[in-house]
Amino acid sequence: MRYSYSFAFLLFSYCLTNLLFAQSNDRIQGRIIQQDGRPIPEATIKIADQTVLSHSDGSFKSTKAIKGRQIIRISAIGYVPHMDTLDMDNAKKVFLEIILYPKENTIDQVEVRGKTQIQKLKEEPIRSIIIDAKAVAEQPNSLAEVMNRAPGIRIRQSGGVGNQVDVSINGFQGNAVQYFRDGIPLEYLGGGYGINNVPINQLEHVEIYKGVVPVNLGGDALGGAVNLVTNQNHKKTFQASYEVGSFNTHLINLSGQQQFRNNWFAGIDAFVNYSDNDYKVDIETVDENANLKPARVKLFHNAYKHYFTEAYAGIKNKKWADELRLSIALYQIDRQSQHPALMTNPYGAIKLNNKGIVPSIRYKKSFWDDRIDLDQFVSYSSTNRHRTDTVKGTFDWYGKFTPGTSVGESPNPSLASIDYKNIINRTALSFHIAPQHQIHANFILNRNTRQGSDPLGFRFTGTDIDILSKEATYQKSILGLSWESNWFNKKLTNQLFIKHFSFTSKGINAFLNNDTDINKYKSVSDQSWGFGNAVKYQINNKSFIRASVELTNRLPLQEELFGDNDTRAPNFDLKPERSFNANLGYRYATNNFAAEVGTFYRRTKGMILLTPIQSPFSQYKNLDSIQGYGFDIDLSYKVFKNFEVTGNATWQDIRMVDIGVPLYKWIEGTRLTNTPYFFSNIGLKANFQNVFTKNDAIKPYIHYNFIREFYLVHIPKDKEADGFLGLTGSSQVDTKDLVPDQSLMNVGFNYVFPSSRWSLSAEVKNLMDSKLYDYYKIQRPGRSWHFKINYYIKSIKS
């Protein structure tokens, strides 16, 4: 593998940082914020003969040095103007944090202004779905539930709280979708932080990219990406919440930040998730005559417990750093396993454990009068995963234990303990080469190693040497460059980008090979290029049209190359997946109404799929190609003053094409399995002020979700549901091969106390107690009740 471009890029970043370090900073800097600490973008700052606008994060800097005694004036639409006097004679650098207060008679105007940040993200040339986490933070909802209401998005879960989650974006799922936290690949947190466990209170918003992914995320995603943006509030804050629900569910969230003198700060984010997940499911059990009969049973070995804490400290607004932040995260996950991938038979003693420690450092600095921005992140994580399957005997669905002679409930007993070491480096540079032109560069280097032991696991043939005891390494690097330009008075925005992907992996292929030398490592590597373009044309101040295309790649993952030393065999011949993505969309929005229509086309070649080879083993192979297209529509309308109606619908046609294996040629043209092709959402929410007393509020809401039946196996096209888009007819397949139509309704309310520090919420999930399925027809919980209390302090006195 060639590292020349990687080394050159890092060397260039380092030299540029040192070259510009001594640049003069004799100017005024600051940040314009609201009362609750949220930034105010595009505020006007006037001082001396200069006029500047605040950025999206509320920050600003004077364009040249300021001398003497000067008056500074700040104004923004919907806010009371602010004026102050500064004495710069004895100051080289001044940092101001200025709070603007909303005008009392412009509540509606302030409300619209508060959405500007989210709106600006929605209007980028590369389309993304933006979820405002603050708008739903007080509700007893998980992040997965909120994301499930977005157009083109389906969240598949293998059960209840904390269980496996898979995001499907326009039909593409699994490893084709990648996850980030504040622009950093989420892999650095080793499974301790994700959409299946993070409290929505700790997020500012969520960005979901469909197909085309911007350079600043730096991933090798094919189907899209999810970026979790955490609270970036630098004020002194504290917030906590506690949620209790059915199935002995308890969710605790806590976060706070304190500021100190000389721009030092420190904070903590923590949460605890626990649930018995002992809801009832419909299964088949064996009667006294050894015949299968339907039964409804309560899950008895499905509990989940998760602890996560991240503490951080740093300094900001210094001549040598805009922000330097050190953090350390600790987590532990304990999970019981109730059944294998399918609900075929129960387990009663298998346990999974995952724990880790993750220190990291992040450095941000602007140079050369804000013409160059540097964002550097480095982390090292040490995690351990443990699987215990040692019981001698079996359990039935009622929890009754029958002793046996063989070890383990599953086909592969285990006492595995595997250590993972991971290093991630992310370097991002932005060059403002002209008022309407920017160049962005992003480089990610991800290296991890795996080594462990399993007294009950596989051995090298003819030896007693544990396969897990031999170290496996994996490294990938991704370099992206983009040129963003504005034309015709910003009516036309264009983003042209190029990416380079490379990986190298080293390990031992010991699968069913009597001649394997346990000291002979095999190395594999590959590299490829991707490129694309995104363009947006602003028709008027209410509407725009945008389009994007991308040719991209996804590199094989370590577990796909090396297997899991269990039932998944290694395959060192895997090649990167390659995909062509295209999007076209139109958006129209006013203060009270918004509508967006989007279409997409995807074609993926050499898709990496898990394929059976010889029982009980399977192996990842470059087998199939997938072609998909579809559309979605997203609507919202504010009715009168207190109500808002939202709705969206998605139809997609994702099919298998170019099947190369003659044995599987019959699946040519069939739908991608386990993937819904139509789903829709409708929501209604209200906001009533001064209901029981002055300054209180009650916010009721209702959400309805519909999913059309979809197939668990490949179905011939003539057996699929007929009618318009397959929405009105019935399929001609066995009911065990499909997931039926599903309807989900959730109803709840949120009450905000007059002080605005306390709020209380309640929600009934699955109000109609419908049968719901997900992830290969794994049954989801029925009707459940949830209550949540929130406490928030906007400012803590030092």
What kind of feature is each model-predicted range?
Residues 96-98, 200-239:
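A beta-strand signature from Gram-negative outer-membrane beta-barrel systems
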Residues 303, 314, 582, 638, ...:
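Conserved C-terminal beta-signal and adjacent last beta-strands/turns
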Residues 488-491, 501-503, 509, 601-603, ...:
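Gram-negative outer-membrane beta-barrel transporters
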Residues 356, 418, 472-474, 520-530, ...:
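Outer-membrane beta-barrel signature, preferentially recognizing the C-terminal barrel domain
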Residues 312-333, 354-515, 520-550, 589, ...:
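Face-selective signature of the C-terminal outer-membrane beta-barrel domain
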Residues 139, 144-185:
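Extracytoplasmic beta-strand/coil segments of soluble accessory domains associated
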Residues 60-63, 184-210:
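Short acidic/polar hinge/loop motifs at secondary-structure boundaries
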Residues 33-38, 44, 75-79, 89-137:
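Short, acidic, small-residue-rich periplasmic hinge/interaction motif at the N-terminus
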